Amino acid sequence: MAAANVSVVIPARNAAETLAEAIESLQAQTLTGWEAVVVEDGSTDETAELARALARTDSRIVVVDGAGRGVSAARNAGIERARYPLLAFLDADDLIRPTLYEHATARLERDAALAGVHCGWARLAPGGEIVDAVPAKIEGDLFTEFARHCLFPIHACVVRTDLVRSAGAFDERLTTCEDWDLWLRVTRYGRPFAAIQAVLALYRMRPRSASLDAPRLLADGLGVIAQARRPDPRVQGPVAHERGLASDDLAVNGLNHACWTAGLAIGSGVDPEPLLDAVRSTAPIPAEPLVMAGCLFASTVLPRCLTPADWTGLADELRDPIDSFLTSAEEVARLPGLASRVWRRLEEKILAASPRGVTTRIGTSAALDIEVTEPLADIEVADGVERLVCRIALEGEPFGVLGLPACDGLLPGAVLADAIAGELGWSLLTRFLTGSTLPSLALRDRGTHLEVVRGSTPVGRVPPGTQLGPAVLNGPVGWAVFLQELFDRPEWPPEWFYHPPRPSRHGRPRSEATVELSGEISPMTPAPANPAVVMTLGGAPLGLVTVQCRDGGVAPERLVAHAVRSAGVELALVAVREALVGRPLRSGGALRARLQAAAEREGAETAAPHELVLARRQPLDIGGPASRSYALPVGAASELLESARATDEPVVKDGSFHTHVRYAPELIPALPVVPAPSRAPLRRRLLARARVRRTSSATQVTRELPILMYHRVDESGAEALARYRITPARFEEHLRYLRDEGFRSVTFGELGEAMRLRRPLPGRCVLVTFDDGCADFLEHAQPLLAQYGFTATLFVVTDRVGATNSWDAAYGDVVELLDWDALRELTAAGVAIGSHSATHPYLTSLSSADVVREAARSRAAIARELGVAPVALAYPYGDVDAIVRHLAGGCGYPYAVTTEGRHAALTDNRLALPRIEVPGWFTALDLADLLNGPRL
């Protein structure tokens, strides 16, 4: 590749105020080999003179006359003049940071298959503040992304020149969305893009920008969205996406784009409702409230050149026009409750972005500022507040945002601490270990990799070139160091915590069935065969662990190994909660000493007056939602009690009425015959089943699990719901492909085991799910599943079992649903049954009490009718947010699935597992693309 390898096209019209600064950002590039083609496009100010003056001082700059034909024609003139194989665009009022072209060209030189490289970007406010930073994370084939929205601004990408030319360059008929249209055509080839996460491109906010013309933006954008769903004759040569995408999502993406332009109109003081005329549909639109809220949130402030933090002062002013627009959008979408769902998401975004230190309330949502190193007490909230946006800070710096319900005017400190540990625990632990343990680590060059050592003990490996910094602790190395610190065994390599060396018999024998892991662990002698041991950490019970007894006892090393294998990453979360949350990081001693001090503290009372306490579920399953703390609405107490009775789960009641409901995972049993030690009191008894574990001899492993989502298997049905219906022949084609490619079925329990230990599933795995519980599952799907050796999870709407799918009535597709007898037959045949709620509502539109009623009533019905609790919850329509997710865990669901279309990672939240929808028209080849395509 030539030394000067990037041609940078800069259209300039009346840009005398900003052109020099844009050129300066180009001249500051660490890659010096570039040329700038400045296309002067009929300016009436001094732009032309300035451009020529700049060219006289730098031979890499050339000036071309654009004749005032518009920005697309100007860029095309620059493309025609470009001499180099790599191409970039830079508007005359935007900026790039110094390393953009160096990093991008290096990636393109290393990988000839790449079409381009894009980077993170941010907006530059008039006052010079950098706001709305968007790191670049998405890589690979980006056609599907651009078919929905414009992924990045034009100057945040370096692309191969020949691809832009063969794609037809810019469409000069477009006055807006011309860059989106070009990227869509370039990505139609299917060649991958790489991403540089760092923010290296700055987009200047301008009050009179063409990108703020709402009607024009809507018309042009809808044209781009539609073009993505049909062939494009402008693109030359063979392309991967010749026919474009299916058109079934055209309406929903059009509505999303209408929300973006509506925000521009609202921010400009213009009535946005006429914009909806362009996206009216004859059928209901499956709207995306989160995307709609995101569009309104991002675009409404742009006409005023404001930042997201300014929303706090705008919310009251703009509530009426936003309300009016969303009410009309709900009518257009024919989707009751849509307006409230979008508003809730918008409230969350506004509160998360509002200035810290200001307690803000919008509707039923309120913001709280939480400093993680300060003690966490119970927080009383104002009447009417149901949803809390908790803005978490660590030593005064923003650290994360959590969404939690405020049930009956209270957020218990224990629930908040547990949520912080559950959502942000690993980041907090890494920060602590960086200060306490990182200095003891060193790197050794082993040729193919670098070995991380602590003293003389290897603790992991990292790629060549890795620097010894905090990032080293974000993975297996950090996990190994944590275990060494927790058990005070810095000389143990990681594998010894799972398979210890020859056990010692040193230490005072003990017979108690409780082991505090931060203290001295002595042999258990004598011990019954395979005793159930209560493991505690910092005085907090983790759960029951069944240990293997040898020679009448259990050695300390084996107790450590059992704890690590049984609790997995829950050890880290509990250690963070008990030793770090609510305490200063820079004082207080080492992690183990902090936990020992916590173990000596007195425990809380079992139940406060008039408090209904639900005790620990599934004590043998450590680390899932059953290990978290929840506050639940007292308005749903009867449904929660019904669910507990149906599943034979213990309840602690106090008084004849209740003012609060709490799920307390610390209430774990001891064995009836064994007394509990004084410093880790046990408050209840509970029987539990052991898990059944599968093994596989396969050498291949699955690190990211595809969870497939089907609905119906039948020959006919309403055309509007064709994507949710697959014919038996095509479904058999899918199963045959899975069998022939060596896939095997796994259960949610197996996935949970892998997630707890962060260890891949053995073999090539898939998890098959069906939503709704249609009667055709028994007739068509189950026989084929059995024939090809697969199992499935069936999610049923319990109030509609034996009836019809009333939620699809608007589409004219009345389908019979399985009755309880059929579900019992399927359960006996090995089909796992999950909940799809009681009535199939949009859960985010409901109050907290109604969410719990839906989830708990459905769970109780399945347990009562089938004799087993549902294995998981499938959120109806995939409609979920942080509040719904939290409440689902509190109702007792160990897993929950969404409709987010990607593979499930071992680090995913168990209550927000993604699923890959399989449309009815997908062939086995299409399924192969789904399974083998981009993972995250």
For each predicted feature, which ranges?
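A short, conserved beta-to-alpha structural element at the edge of catalytic cores
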Residues: 203, 789-810
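C-terminal subregions of glycosyltransferases and related glycan-biosynthesis enzymes
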Residues: 207-363, 369-378, 389-450, 455, ...
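Membrane-proximal basic amphipathic "stem/tether" segments
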Residues: 297-350, 648, 652-704, 920-936
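Short, basic/aromatic recognition patches
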Residues: 356-389, 498-532
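Acidic (Asp/Glu)-rich catalytic clusters
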Residues: 783-789, 816-834
